[in-house]
């Protein structure tokens, strides 16, 4: 089993977001995580959110505790502040679930 989230983002700076992904991936792997799917979206046909979305991905961890530890990791938070905050305008949490 694993714990998975489907996330929609509105990315405003592709280059900086790519730097964020490159910098955070080793920390993600250390916490037993990874990306299962990753899409660049040009048209949203239906959304329950009023936030724009141009990127959708599935991120997974071995369990929910690993996810929580990753998102509170000091090294990750530093990378998030440096790259994510200025490259992403909106985050939509579409779903979170245990995958069997």
Each model region followed by its residue ranges:
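Short S/T/G/P-rich N-terminal loop/turn motif that feeds into the first structured element of a domain
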Residues: 1-72, 96-100
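C-terminal structural segments of small proteins and small subunits
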Residues: 67-89
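C-terminal end-helix/capping segment
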Residues: 85-100
């Amino acid at each position: 089993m694993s714990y998975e989230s489907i996330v929609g983002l509105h990315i405003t700076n592709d280059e900086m977001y790519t730097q964020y992904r490159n910098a955070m991936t080793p920390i993600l792997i250390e916490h037993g995580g990874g990306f299962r799917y990753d899409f660049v979206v040009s048209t949203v046909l239906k959304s329950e959110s009023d936030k724009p979305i141009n990127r959708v991905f599935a991120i997974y961890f071995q369990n929910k505790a690993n996810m929580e530890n990753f998102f509170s990791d000091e090294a990750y938070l530093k990378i998030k502040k440096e790259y994510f905050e200025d490259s992403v305008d909106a985050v939509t949490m579409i779903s979170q679930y245990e995958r069997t």
